[in-house]
Amino acid sequence: PVAMFYYSYQPQGVSPGCRTRILRHLELQMNGDEPLAFFITWTVYGSFLQGDNRWWRKRQQGEQPPQPKLAQWHRDRLNHLVLILDEPQRLAVVNEIARLCEYRGWQLWKAVARTNHVHAVVTATGYAGSRVRDQLKANCTRVLREQWAIFVDRPVWTTGGDWQCVNTEEELDRVILYVSEAQDRKELDA
């Protein structure tokens, strides 16, 4: 089971400010204007290390092939156990994303918390994707630590995360479909 929210599509205005970003599973076209939305992803601490056999991303170099020795090197250096999110924790994350988006006046198109990562599709006019991601992560961390002692005094998430600009309604539909279904149906992940 996956905790999800889906909101109907209502286009926002555009203004200057985004660059091209490419995901292995989705290629998004950038038009130089403020994006229609951000596709934001972050992972649970230790669950997706550099060298991972599922491929991994290297800053400014994109997708990288598996490197088992590198992945093992990172695993050996983890300072905390790797935790996965159970259903109540995933629901708490999705609810907090929805709460924060409403509070900030951001449009939440979709939020899904999986056992080892989180996806959110958000329109936040006037904000950088990294800032939106960081605010979502910080608030989700607070909620998890308030409700579950296991998350206190340890990192909950991997440092950083990913954000991609979504500029067209077609891209928005593809991203929402990916977040909703492609994790379970990899044939849609093309």
Label each residue range with its predicted role.
Residues 1-190:
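Short catalytic/metal-binding and nucleic-acid-binding patches
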